[in-house]
Amino acid sequence: MNIAKLAIKVAVKIPKIEQFERYLFIGPHADDIEIGAGATVAKLASMGKKITFLICTDGRFGDGASDGVKGDALAELRKTECLKSAKLLGVEDVRFLGLKDGGGYVYDDLLKKLAETVSEVNPQIIFAPDHLSGSESHEDHLNVGKAARTIACFAPYENLMTDRFSVKGADVEAIAFYMTSRPNRFVKVKGLLNKQFDSIFKCHTSQYKEGAPESDSLKLYMKIRYYQYGCKEGFRVYSKTHMHCLPEAD
């Protein structure tokens, strides 16, 4: 038995996701939040929580099912799709950084833009893709997960945020990673899977064609995870105490 790990588990509780009031969901691309956390978003919105979506890249290279729409036109289309999807889930505050899809940006620019948004929105918990899942290899997902983790850690330190990013600090209390293979917190989302599917397959139609093998495979995968977790979505959650100098918290 790892005594240090047990002591941390007892002394520093993993926050419950529903306990907060202000949420920032960060997506590398326009459809990632819906895939990784769409049912949870719908539940939180129905509870009256304040939710902001932040989409980091323009998605211009996600053209595998876009019927020939490419480049700037696809980037604009994906914005429209994202706004439609967010509204279906109950989210009105949607923001776009407009960074070039596929890692075509400077990482420090992403970091600064995240700091600016976190300072402005002042979320209590930040959601981002798990960049440490092992198999994840997309540069945008790796960059966004890492940057979100850094800002979640730095945000409560007013002087640090001002000195490095020229913004105010924020009252971030936790980070939650979606698309993770290591969940330690679960949100009951019974009855919300179809709404999550609609937010993906009826809104992001440039990415998912009805009846296409890729769409059917994604639906099946999401159903398996949903039932595997007992009609819940799973996340890897750390409080601000877990984020620094406590390796056993992992």
PLM regions and their residue ranges:
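Active-site rim/loop-helix segments in enzyme catalytic domains that contact anionic ligands
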Residues: 1-121, 245-248
